[in-house]
A protein has these predicted regions:
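Transmembrane alpha-helices
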Residues: 1-148, 176, 210, 220, ...
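USP/UBP deubiquitinase core
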Residues: 136-203
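Beta-sandwich strand segments
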Residues: 206-208
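Non-catalytic accessory segments adjacent to catalytic cores
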Residues: 214-216
Length: 348
């Protein structure tokens, strides 16, 4: 039986590796093409190539569910077309045992993806964005809003060295505007923020008063480590960062839905991958030997895209209709498991 596990695993590992190389290669060529404009604007090919290479861990992590799905269809499909699965069944090996062998083989990729997505991809993606910022000459983040009590703060951008640019603070009391402060930059020095080149405007006896200052200590709870979170898409963050920033947003009275959605999607990705593999197994055993490799790949791509599309729709819908993001990402997984179980039962 141990030899059976190894034999099935070799077929699946080889198929998944080939599928990953094909998908990743196509995606990297597309990404390189989208960055060619930067070469015309003075960037070197080395800088662009460095950026592309640094995004590889993130791309591998994102493609892993689809890659494993298609790889299992190809690997198991090859065994089915050679009647090897039929021979295994005739030798007394149960369908459940074959499914278990496949799941063990896939677990290697699931574990690798989890480690990659939590410890490698967030770091390399941040480095990639810094590299892109340097050769494009743009700020490392787009504008973002913060809230501190009655203060509403807008930061237009953050440089790669963590310096805030164009900080605007609007202070309200009882829904009435009290004061506006605009600073050219904000720097974290020691253990506090310092605003520089600032102007403060307020209303006094129906007269607008304006005062300028060179610098001012800014008492705000925003920590420098949160800036790296703000500069990245929630989908690219580590689970620890998602939890930390979600808590900060809740404490500030701001919407944390995008980060909560990304948290649950990341937590459930291993289960999502395994559920797609279950669908792949059921499709192979539930179909005839005449199914071609192209048909299996097409089915795998369609199922993977449909699964991802449903998750992307249900995720934001959970915020609109008020149900938990956990349910939004869990429902497609349960549907895949139920559908796979039904097809396997029909296959005997």
């Amino acid at each position: 039986v141990r030899l059976l596990d190894i034999y099935i695993a070799r077929h699946i590992w080889a198929a998944v590796a080939i599928v990953l190389l094909v998908i990743l290669g196509l995606d990297l060529m597309t990404a390189l093409g989208s960055e060619l404009d930067a070469l015309d604007n003075g960037a070197s090919f080395k800088q662009v190539l460095t950026y592309i290479v640094l995004t590889v861990p993130r791309r591998v992590y994102e493609f892993m569910p689809l890659t494993v799905l298609v790889g299992c269809l190809v690997g198991l499909g090859a065994l089915a077309n050679n009647s090897e699965l039929t021979v295994m069944r005739a030798a007394g090996i149960s369908l459940r045992r074959i499914v278990w062998s496949v799941m063990q083989a896939v677990a290697v990729f699931v574990l690798a993806a989890a480690i990659l997505g939590e410890f490698v991809a967030p770091v390399s993606q941040k480095m990639a964005e810094i590299e892109q910022t340097q050769y494009k000459g743009a700020a490392s983040t787009k504008g973002f809003w913060l809230r501190e009590g009655n203060d509403y703060i807008f930061v237009r951008s953050v440089k790669s060295d963590g310096v805030l640019q164009d900080v605007s603070r609007y202070r309200f009391a009882d829904n009435n505007w009290q004061q506006t402060l605009v600073a050219k930059t904000g720097e974290y020095q020691g253990s506090q923020w310092t605003l520089k080149q600032l102007q403060t405007v307020w209303l006094e006896d129906q007269i607008i008063v304006q005062q300028g200052q060179d610098d001012m200590v800014w008492p705000v709870s925003l920590k420098p480590n949160l800036l790296s979170i703000l500069s990245m898409d929630p989908q690219h963050l580590a689970i620890e960062d998602l939890v930390e920033y979600s808590e900060y947003l809740h404490q500030s009275g701001l919407d944390a839905a995008p980060y909560e959605l990304a948290f649950w999607k990341k937590i459930l990705q291993p289960l999502a991958t395994l559920s797609l593999v279950f669908v792949a197994i059921s499709f192979v055993f539930g179909s005839t030997r005449s199914v071609t490799l192209g048909q299996r790949v097409l089915v795998g791509v369609l199922v993977g895209l449909a699964f991802n599309y449903v998750q992307e729709v249900l995720g934001p819908a959970s915020s609109v209709f008020g149900f938990t993001p956990l349910l939004a990402y869990l429902m497609p997984i349960l549907v895949c498991v139920a559908g796979g179980a039904w097809m396997l039962r029909k296959a005997g």
